[in-house]
Swiss-Prot record:
Family that this chain belongs to: Belongs to the universal ribosomal protein uS4 family.
Subunit structure: Part of the 30S ribosomal subunit. Contacts protein S5. The interaction surface between S4 and S5 is involved in control of translational fidelity.
The keyword Ribonucleoprotein is assigned to this record: yes
GO terms under cellular component: chloroplast; small ribosomal subunit
Domain S4 RNA-binding: from-to ranges: 82-143
CDD domains, alphabetized: S4
This protein's name: Small ribosomal subunit protein uS4c
Database matches in InterPro entries: Ribosomal_uS4, Ribosomal_uS4_bac-type, Ribosomal_uS4_CS, Ribosomal_uS4_N, S4_RNA-bd, S4_RNA-bd_sf
Amino acid sequence: RFKKIRRLGALPGLTSKRPRSGSDLKNQLRSGKRSQYRIRLEEKQKLRFHYGLTERQLLKYVHIAGKAKGSTGQILLQLLEMRLDNILFRLGMASTNPGARQLVNHRHILVNGRIVDIPSYRCKPRDIITTKNKQKSKALIQNFIASSPHQEELPNHLTIDPFQYKGLVNQIIDSKWIGLKINELLVVEYYSRQT
């Protein structure tokens, strides 16, 4: 993880750690001139590692975004942001995307009153995300919510009730709330040149 954030910069979905300010300067000095391919590859890797996706999963999302109407890059980010594991991370119910994925896989999370154990489940507006009534589930979420540093910076497409361990998806995310310095068009270009 530390090698990844040193090379690609801060990835809040992967880890809460940040690269040291000097390491970024060293990377620029050491790397010399960066090719266009390398720049596109790094942007793609940022997206992959932030959301914790495999190459195949990301490629699938790029194909879905390409078929939809509108800007492919914006739609790609919206698809990734509306994943259940990422919504849990944004709500502060998990400290990282891998942590959120584990909560979902271990069946601690309910969407609209039903257990969902698929981290890639696509949330829709008006979905209500809660924890199971078991003490263990509530204790896990309570620890994350209490230690969540971005509680006051909750995106406007989400609402959380920390006392009832409940989150609400109000709408599809606006791109300014992504919180990741990324040029999504370079990711789309990377895949368009691969085929």
